[in-house]
């Protein structure tokens, strides 16, 4: 009988100990240079953002996309069979709505100062790597220089869009559909493809 009681006590002790070892779920940490893609983490000493800088950038991008979608819904939908002239008219109408809705927008609203520092450090780090000269050559291929741009401006129709080097593109935070990164000179712009509008930009991302 005493032996049975000892077994019961031992079993209860094991159960209690096992329960104590269970870990409580952890909250998801904000995205930073440490949790971003490997390419970003490699240059953590160059332009390292504070906690949540990339997360804040993503949040501001999402806010812009929500606004654009809301405004786009007020326009008549254009069918796939629309003529280039009709598509251009729709694009310009959307740009006008977006520009009016964010009339007070300025450079640095989406790419905030710490994010700008982070982007500059990232791009300069990639260009300083062993494939830097090749990437720079790709970066400058058909890259328009000396072009004036401003937030809420339409991307110039006479200027070809530069090709984004895969190494640079892979290191930057991913963007939602219809938003793209593009270079205009040594400025990295955030382009709304649907409205053909410059959402924001970062100056002097590399030396020319």
Locate each region found by the language model:
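Early exported N-terminus immediately downstream of N-terminal targeting peptides
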Residues: 50-114
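Bacterial N-terminal signal peptides
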Residues: 8-17
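Bacterial N-terminal signal peptides that target proteins for export
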Residues: 1-8
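Post-signal peptide N-terminal segment of mature Sec-exported envelope proteins
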Residues: 27-52, 56
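Mid-length scaffold segments of soluble, non-membrane domains
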Residues: 89-164
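Amphipathic, charged alpha-helical segments and their helix-to-coil junctions
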Residues: 136-208
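Bacterial signal peptide processing site
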Residues: 19-23
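Short, low-complexity, intrinsically disordered N-terminal modules
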Residues: 17-18, 29
């Amino acid at each position: 009988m005493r032996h049975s009681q000892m077994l019961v006590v031992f079993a209860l002790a094991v159960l209690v100990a096992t329960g104590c070892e269970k870990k409580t779920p952890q909250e998801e940490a904000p995205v930073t240079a440490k949790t971003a893609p490997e390419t970003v983490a490699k240059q953590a000493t160059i332009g390292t953002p504070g906690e949540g800088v990339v997360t804040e950038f993503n949040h501001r991008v999402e806010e812009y996309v929500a606004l654009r979608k809301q405004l786009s819904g007020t326009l008549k939908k254009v069918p796939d069979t629309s003529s280039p002239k009709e598509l251009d008219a729709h694009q310009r109408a959307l740009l006008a709505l977006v520009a009016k809705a964010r009339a007070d927008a300025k450079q640095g609203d989406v790419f905030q100062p710490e994010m700008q520092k982070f982007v500059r450090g990232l791009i300069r780090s990639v260009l300083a790597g062993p494939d830097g000269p090749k990437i720079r050559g790709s970066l400058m291929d058909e890259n328009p220089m000396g072009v004036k741009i401003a937030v809420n401006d339409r991307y110039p129709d006479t200027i070809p869009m530069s090709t984004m080097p895969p190494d640079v593109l892979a290191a930057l935070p991913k963007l939602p559909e219809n938003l793209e990164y593009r270079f205009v000179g040594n400025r990295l712009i955030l382009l709304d493809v649907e409205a053909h509008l410059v959402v924001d930009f970062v100056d002097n991302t590399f030396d020319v």
